[in-house]
Design a protein with these regions (language model features):
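Beta-strand-centric surfaces of beta-sandwich/beta-rich domains
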Residues: 1-190
Length: 190
């Protein structure tokens, strides 16, 4: 609701889309800043989902105060389209859901001294962009080798082995399971 009250069940109900830190002008285009933090550190997970997406969104990773992005490409291609890595490090769920309606995840560590990630492009009216960036900040003075695509290519065998090992792990069942039949839904997990 547009008039949600703190403490009500719908406080800020699903109104968290397209909320960016700021908008910047760069090379004649508007860029929407999603993430900015003190370094050194590493982005360890990015989650994105979209609504009314027109396939024109560009994601740019500016690292170490560079004006040239270390990574640049169409949003879903970068996050879950295997541009940087394969499954399960770059993935989207659920496969039963249409691609643009899925949650898209990238678990590839992107180390930096000073980061900045922008979602750029012309956002048409009605386009909704939901995201979460998880990161780690290291102690001042920690030595971090900033991410480069060249280093990613050099370490392709390590990345392939990691992806393969993760995919070969068995799916563990929970200790407690409850089968719900019919039109019932679990509304309490205690």
């Amino acid at each position: 609701s547009d008039h949600a009250v703190k403490g009500s069940y719908d406080w800020f109900a699903n109104w968290d889309f397209s909320q960016f830190l700021r908008t910047e002008e760069k090379d004649g285009r508007r860029e929407f800043v999603m993430f900015d933090a003190e370094g050194p550190g590493a982005v360890v997970r990015i989650w994105i989902t979209v609504a009314n997406y027109n396939d024109n969104g560009i994601l740019r990773f500016y690292l170490d105060d560079s004006d040239i992005p270390a990574i640049e490409g169409e949003v879903l291609s970068l996050i879950s389209g295997h541009f940087l890595a394969d499954a399960p490090i770059s993935t989207s769920v659920s496969p039963l859901t249409p691609y643009k309606q899925r949650g898209h995840d990238l678990y590839l560590p992107i180390p930096y001294e000073t980061p900045g990630i922008t979602a750029a492009g012309n956002r048409p009216p009605g386009e909704n962009f939901f995201y979460s960036v998880n990161y780690r900040t290291y102690d001042k003075g920690s030595i971090v080798k900033t991410f480069t695509l060249d280093d990613l290519k050099k370490e392709a065998d390590v990345l392939d082995g990691t992806q393969r090992e993760l995919m070969e792990q068995p799916i563990l069942e929970g200790k407690y399971q409850k089968k719900v039949s019919g039109d019932k839904a679990i509304t309490n997990l205690s």
